[in-house]
């Protein structure tokens, strides 16, 4: 797909999303898909109760459109095993996120799927992704001419990475506009890389995510009119993971998605220290780390703006790795 075609597709998707979001928001509100707030969360979040959620459903439409356009451009001869694996991976995580949002609405509390159920579904989705896409995956990670990881170890680490990164995106979705704004430069670079070095439909899925982010920010900026819910956050993480392995940018993705890894690591550190200290010590006032800054008194829009800047810096560092060791 040429840069012109990709840009036109992105523009059309973003404009269509902007036009369709008001109807989706109304539908979600009427269907009872509204946000429930945890009691232990920051006090400022309690005013957000009742906001429509599961706005990530719009991303499903974008993925379908990108898929149809790709099939049309390649005349039906371009779909590879990796592309099919990527579509399955994104679809399973998006639907599991929607199920989680739906269960929260049905139970009338902020607890949908149990933690182990989420991890099990995500692990199965990742296993399916690598099983279906394996013949077309490189199966190794290299730095220049040096092979750092290969064989079974590659797939073991890749599974952990896939599940971890999907959850990292989910953990970042905690403030109005935070995940959409921080993932926007990530998907912009991923899309540019996919156009410069084509890697099939899986490589173009970031275009669907980028268009979603652009439109979603219009309605999710403080104060939010809609939340993406687990439906959106898990799907965005899945798109990033699919692009990572389809493009062979495993090392660079650690930097491109660095901000999300920081969010996930803050939770891991907090939980580990809390348990090892006999529930007496915490490293952060609250985890993920964006809530730590909330507790310090930072305004929500300041946190979002500064995390966006941090994400841009991580992405630029990732671009250096992409260009230096491709």
Q: Which residue stretches match the model-derived regions?
A:
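"…together with the soluble PPM/PP2C metallo-phosphatase catalytic core" -> "…together
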Residues: 2-262
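Membrane-proximal soluble regions of multi-pass membrane proteins
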Residues: 22, 29-38, 258-306
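Short linear loop/turn motifs
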Residues: 39-46, 303-313
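Short flexible/disordered coil segments
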Residues: 100, 287, 323-324
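Juxtamembrane boundary at the C-terminal end of a transmembrane helix
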Residues: 317-326
């Amino acid at each position: 797909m040429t840069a012109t075609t990709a840009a036109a597709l992105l523009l059309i998707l973003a404009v269509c999303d902007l036009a369709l979001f008001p109807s989706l928001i109304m539908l979600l509100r009427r269907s009872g898909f509204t946000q429930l707030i945890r009691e232990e969360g920051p006090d400022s979040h309690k005013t957000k109760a009742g906001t429509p959620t599961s706005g990530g459903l719009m991303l499903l439409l974008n993925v379908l459109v990108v898929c149809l356009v790709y099939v049309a451009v390649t005349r039906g001869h371009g779909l590879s095993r990796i592309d099919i694996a990527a579509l399955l991976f994104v679809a399973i995580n998006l639907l599991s996120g929607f199920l989680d949002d739906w269960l929260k609405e049905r139970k009338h509390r902020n607890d949908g799927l149990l933690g182990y159920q989420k991890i099990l579904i995500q692990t199965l989705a990742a296993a399916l992704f690598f099983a279906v896409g394996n013949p077309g995956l490189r199966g190794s990670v290299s730095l220049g001419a040096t092979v750092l990881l290969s064989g079974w170890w590659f797939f073991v680490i890749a599974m952990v990475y896939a599940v971890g990164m999907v959850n990292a995106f989910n953990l970042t979705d905690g403030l109005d506009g935070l995940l959409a704004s921080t993932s926007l430069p990530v998907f912009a670079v991923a899309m540019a890389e996919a156009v410069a070095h084509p890697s099939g439909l899986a490589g173009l899925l970031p275009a669907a995510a980028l268009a979603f982010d652009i439109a979603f920010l219009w309605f999710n900026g403080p104060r939010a009119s809609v939340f993406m819910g687990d439906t959106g956050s898990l799907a965005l993480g899945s798109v990033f993971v699919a692009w990572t392995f389809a493009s062979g940018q495993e090392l660079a993705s650690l930097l491109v998605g660095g901000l999300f890894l920081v969010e996930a690591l803050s939770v891991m550190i907090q939980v580990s220290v809390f348990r090892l200290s006999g529930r007496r010590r915490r490293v952060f006032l609250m985890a993920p780390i964006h809530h730590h800054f909330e507790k310090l008194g930072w305004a929500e829009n300041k946190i979002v703006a500064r995390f966006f800047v941090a994400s841009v810096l991580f992405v630029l560092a990732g671009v250096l790795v992409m260009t230096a060791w491709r």
